[in-house]
Amino acid sequence: MAGKLRKSHIPGVSIWQLVEEIPEGCSTPDFEQKPVTSALPEGKNAVFRAVVCGEPRPEVRWQNSKGDLSDSSKYKISSSPGSKEHVLQINKLTGEDTDLYRCTAVNAYGEAACSVRLTVIEVGFRKNRKRHREPQEDLRKELMDFRKLLKKRAPPAPKKKMDLEQIWQLLMTADRKDYEKICLKYGIVDYRGMLRRLQEMKKEQEDKMAQYINTISSLRHIRVTKDGNAKFDLELDLKDSQSKIYLYKDGEMIPYGFNNQTKHCLRRLGKRYEFQIQDLRPEDSGIYQVKVEDAVVFSTELEASAIPPRVVVPLAETHCEEQGDAVFECTLSSPCPSAAWHFRHRLLHPSDKYEVYVSPDGLTHRLVVRGARFSDMGPYSLGTGLYTSSAWLVVEAGKDKDLQSTSADHKLQSRRSGKDGRLDIYGERRDATRSSTSRYKPGTGSFSKDAQGPMGHFSQGLADMEVQPGEAATLSCTLTSDLGPGTWFKDGVKLTTQDGVIFKQDGLVHSLFITHVQGTQAGRYTFVAGDQQSEATLTVQDSPTIAPDVTEKLREPLVVKAGKPVIVKIPFQSHLPIQAAWRKDGAEVVGSSDREAQVDLGDGYTRLCLPSAGRKDCGQYSVTLRSEGGSVQAELTLQVIDKPDPPQGPMEVQDCHRAGVCLRWRPPRDNGGRTVECYVVERRQAGRSTWLKVGEAPADSTTFTDAHVEPGRKYTFRVRAVTSEGAGEALESEEILVAPEALPKAPSAPAILSASSQGITLTWTAPRGPGSAHILGYLIERRKKGSNTWTAVNDQPVPERRWTVADVRQGCQYEFRVTAVAPSGPGEPGPPSDAVFARDPMRPPGLVRNLQVTDRSNTSITLSWAGPDTQEGDEAQGYVVELCSSDSLQWLPCHVGTVPVTTYTAKGLRPGEGYFVRVTAVNEGGQSQPSALDTLVQAMPVTVCPKFLVDSSTKDLLTVKVGDTVRVPVSFEAMPMPEVTWLKDGLPLPKRSVTVTKDGLTQLLIPVAGLSDSGLYTVVLRTLQGKEVAHSFRIRVAACPQAPGPIHLQENVPGTVTAEWEPSPDEAQDVPLHYAVFTRSSAHGPWHEAADRIHTNRFTLLGILPGHEYHFRVVAKNELGASKPSDTSQPWCIPRQRDRFTVKAPCYREPDLSQKPRFLVGLRSHLLPQGCECCMSCAVQGSPRPHVTWFKNDRSLEGNPAVYSTDLLGVCSLTIPSVSPKDSGEYKAVAENTLGQAVSTATLIVIEPST
């Protein structure tokens, strides 16, 4: 049966349309109500009701797996006239009636069918009754054998052990939201430790990456595309474009290419690097790393669960007889819970008709089609999302027409390599010659073919073909014997000559001709002859087409203005699914945001949208439309016009002096798509905000000269390129100063050649530098010494550089200066000359007198002398000091110029070297004869006898307290340095005493003074000649005195009291001491000094008053301090004699002052930092006087050594010397007496210091 399958609005109902077109008012059969599955006990009657519809009224038939229900005593089929309801009643149910019952409604236009299962519940001994169930038993046995076969699969591959270093690299580039998942996957339990280590590793990695990379951004982890490929990408800004990039998988480097022909490929676009993994398989899972040289820059993981399952064992074509069961089986590379079965692109759901099985490992999927009919014939497929495996079910007619019971020989058909006539997992069509005698042998795990029967078979089957639309196609096959004319089918539908095909038979060769192939004629063609059949696929390469007028329009460049949107819509025609790929200058156009390019593919068109066109969008665009039938490409040129870029700089600005300012620039990098017409030049004066247009330069010139500038002013220039779109951005220069015409520089100071009372002759040198090339002459000026007024000597410039000034006054002192004159004007005056007298030349001075050496050192000699005897006109104006070494005959001056005074120190001499010295007087008339010393002077200090520098502040006796540090400096002078020796009591110093001598100072240091350090210390200075000088002083080391002994009081004279005490034990020592006596009149009163500096052991206090108590205290003192006091044990008191008198006390009743405790001032809370002292106080009142007890957190603090409390006249205090956090808490003071108690509480909070 051939036809077209349609859907029903009731699930479980299949409708097969037998004709191409149904006349108006007619329809195929359908069910309004299908029978309901029932489970009834044995002996009951089963009733199935079906309500059918259709025009003309369909005929209803009931069947089961055994055939017709012709036994009228067992089966009763009825329907009411005019009613759509049809009833099947099964009487007296037995276990044999358990079966699948099928209701079929048929009319002239189609067939509708549904199935229902009846289950008979047996009771008693009938449960164990053996029934005839060969087909079911065979099916069950086959399924069990198949399950055993699945259990024999190899154990799963062991899980790959990942390198811990790779896991850390993966964490460094992973998103923070994925940290927890990665840690759980690889068993990292210390999450905080992981974060700390990750931070350290990131710093190390950044330092390492900084050697090769400027920046890295836009990291996108690995993802699987719809094409079954995986890709990941990142943006890298390499410091060196020649740096090598490596790709690693699980720590091993893998090669990659640059096109889609390799397993791993790299695509680069600018700074973006995209890695692709083609043809994903389970073994491709793992951690991928990208390295630049030896630095890891990116890590990502491809999980096995992300790899789409592939078809390992595809579906095989299945043959079964009508009403038989057909089995399809497919094995995947990995479990796929979402795998779905389809029949003619219709999703199949598990039901009584279709049973779906999945092996325990989730790899093998099986579909069982129960009760196959001709309407079930067609392609069945299993889809996993990316991959699909398809095969045909061929339903063959049974051996008799009565629908006899069929054995469930739904055996699996063998899949012949290259001849199974179906799509393999790579989508390639293969030819097949399939015989219905192929059978699957259970338990063998392989396929075989039964022996051929005596009938003919195909010696050459149909072959797959691919043709273009409009071409002719021929499908032919050859039989070994004549099996009749045969029948041609297309997609299961019988073909006739009315379908536009031509059938031919030439002997045993059967052919099908199509003169002009159309896209609708593509499909699966089958030729059936007898029980033999051959199939092939005719593919029409219906490539997409673009209208010629559209192509013609695209040849013209598309011109738009910058900032405007660009929308390019290209319509096309195609009967197959289309993929559109846009490219710009060979690079793929991919848009990811509203500001970038957007590519859209609609129904019959593809569109490229640029929201805001820019100059970077200019270029050659192409779009490739690709389908299974072929591809077509269209190209267009996009031109975006805009204002030009600024001219390229920097702008060269040159001051051409009298010609003006010359500007030079380079043409703009981008002219905006239009030719530059001219350049506009503007300038702005410093301090102003207005730009002034100064001119235009032609397009072929990039120079301009502005002659209208003022010297001495600052200007800024800018240049714009101008096109038909307008003026572009400006190139601005730096600020330039237009320099005025250069004036000559100043000449040097004039030199005096000669001077007399008649005139002074000068000479000078010409100036150098800008403006000094053309000197017209020189102006000479003079002034008197001490005056500020310069007077011109000449009115006209002097061309020579020598001049004699004659207008001078004899005896006056003059200074001169010169100014150069050029065509641009006079320059700056030069510096003045030295002062010179207008007088006749002087006579040389006389000899220097009284030359002598006043001081010497190792490197210097100081001289002094007296001036020569003078007469009028020969006074000395300076002196020249010269030295001559003892090993040389040459006199060398010690200074530059002359010495104006009569003393000089020659420095920088060699120690111990001998020198001859001479001095010469100098004036304007010349030099005098030199005056020299007769003896050789050595550069060495003058001998000074040792002497101590002792003054009135120097002490001969030093008293020091025990334990103090002693420092005794002694100053002296001597030359050369003498030998210094320290002695104590005439003997060398002990080792713990330290002496230091340097630069005329020697010092004694005793770090810790003891009583043994007392004594006479002597410093001895001994010269090289053995002469000695000594200085002595005494050091007394003492301690504070000990306390005096007990004090005894007695009254020797009435009205006085005499205090005597035993002397201090230190009184017998050399240190003098004295005593001080103090008294007070009460036990708590202050002490008053009664006497001081008492050198005896007795003191008498006068003015004793009867009835007063007197307490005495004695303290021993010396110059180092006072001793501890010695007090009287009992005070001194003289009884007061009183006269007797009688007092009559008044009688009164004393009031009752009893009162229970109450707090006048309560405790308050404290907030203190750690380590501070805390004092809590309160005031309590009560009679009898209450007793106060302190508590902390309801625990008594009595006996706690860390705190102490006081109670003074009702003011109670609790003191904690140094609080700590453990002292925080609630404190309570409880006051109690015989009448009651009172409580006051407060809180103490101790703040810990922040770390």
Curated annotation (Swiss-Prot):
Gene for this chain: IGFN1
Main location, first listed in the record: nucleus
Location relative to the cell: Nucleus; Cytoplasm, Myofibril, Sarcomere, Z line
Tissues in which the protein is found: Expressed in skeletal muscle.
Species name: Homo sapiens (Human)
Fibronectin type-III domain boundaries: 646-741, 746-845, 847-942, 1043-1137
Protein name, per record: Immunoglobulin-like and fibronectin type III domain-containing protein 1
Source species, domain of life: Eukaryota
CDD domains tied to this protein: FN3
PANTHER family in UniProt: IMMUNOGLOBULIN-LIKE AND FIBRONECTIN TYPE III DOMAIN-CONTAINING PROTEIN 1, TITIN
Lineage of origin: Eukaryota, Metazoa, Chordata, Craniata, Vertebrata
